[in-house]
Amino acid sequence: MKQNKVLLYAGSLKLVEKSGVGQAVRHQMQALKLAGVPFTMNSKEEYSIIHLNTIFPDSLLKSKRAKRKGKKVIYYAHSTMEDFRNSFRGSNLIAPLFKKWITYCYNSGDLIITPTEYSKELLEGYGLKRPIVSLSNGIDTDFFKRNEEARRRFRDKYQIPDTDKVVISVGHYIERKGILDFVKLAERMPNYQFYWFGYTNLNLIPNMIKEAIKKQLPNLHFPGYVTREEVRDAYCGSDLFLFLTHEETEGIVLLEALAAKIPILVRDIPIYKNMFKDRETVYKGKSIEEFEELITQILEGKLPDLTEKGYNMALERDIKVVAQKLLSIYEQE
């Protein structure tokens, strides 16, 4: 299937462009360019393969129409029932229905691509009838490479003295991302600055999340959604990336932090059990007390610097590597 044109279906993409899915689509565009595979986002143009990235009804219809026309359909499985839970208001109630829906969507394709072996195992447990392969969303390590200018821009913009230690996280205002624990830690650790980048419409989130982000703490900051360039500057300008997520299919922001050579502390959850060895590329914790202790030890230089090993892990998932793997997937189809 080499050199056949790919349609990156853009339907409903506007709804997710500020999420990890939107970032994944941008990475696919970059990977296709690097692999020398022609692609379009215009559905009216001729194509042989279609990439679908969302599970909205228009994507399902597009999948079925493409199949009827003899096109190859690759469905990217970014979502699972497990990472849908504890997200938006009412998500836990409809999670079983969500699982049925995404199973139906994914089964409409010829091949399912999902970011990790962990998410692949989850999907295999759904009884999907199509082959599933794991392929990282990838990371542009060149773009996120650490540099002093980026650090200075971040510190200057938010008027942060060089002596202040800064902890950041990136994500939606949803419980699954660990935002409640992030706020608790800011409250318990007034000597450090905590910045959460990202935004979610307040009408979509439960009251407990609204109350948490409205908490008035002098060291807790919610700058909202910022550009990719500003996120990079934040990685370079901060001292710790704190990723308290309860469930992920990969976590693109984690790859970004690895590429930026920032110390990382994650929640010890199943997806990262095999992906990261504790105290080798990242530090892991399970409770508020453990997070508090590890944050202090990392920021005060009492634990080894793991950033070089973390950076090497990001290089393994560099977009150039992903491009070649995607090309080999096409050739096998």
Model-derived segments and spans:
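Conserved donor-binding/catalytic core segment of Leloir-type glycosyltransferases
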Residues: P161-K177, V183-E187, Y195
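Aromatic "clamp/platform" in nucleotide-sugar-dependent glycosyltransferases that forms part
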Residues: H246
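Short hydrophobic beta-strand element within catalytic cores of glycosyltransferases
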Residues: P263-V266
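Short alpha-helical donor nucleotide-sugar binding micro-motif in glycosyltransferases
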Residues: Y106, Y225-V226, D233-S238
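Nucleotide-activated donor-binding/catalytic signature segment of Leloir-type glycosyltransferases, i.e.
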Residues: N207-E229
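Membrane-proximal helix-turn-helix segments that form the acceptor-binding/catalytic region
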Residues: L93-I112
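Glycosyltransferase donor-sugar binding loop
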Residues: V170, Q193-M208
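Conserved acidic donor-binding segment of nucleotide-sugar-dependent glycosyltransferases
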Residues: D278-E289, T296-K302
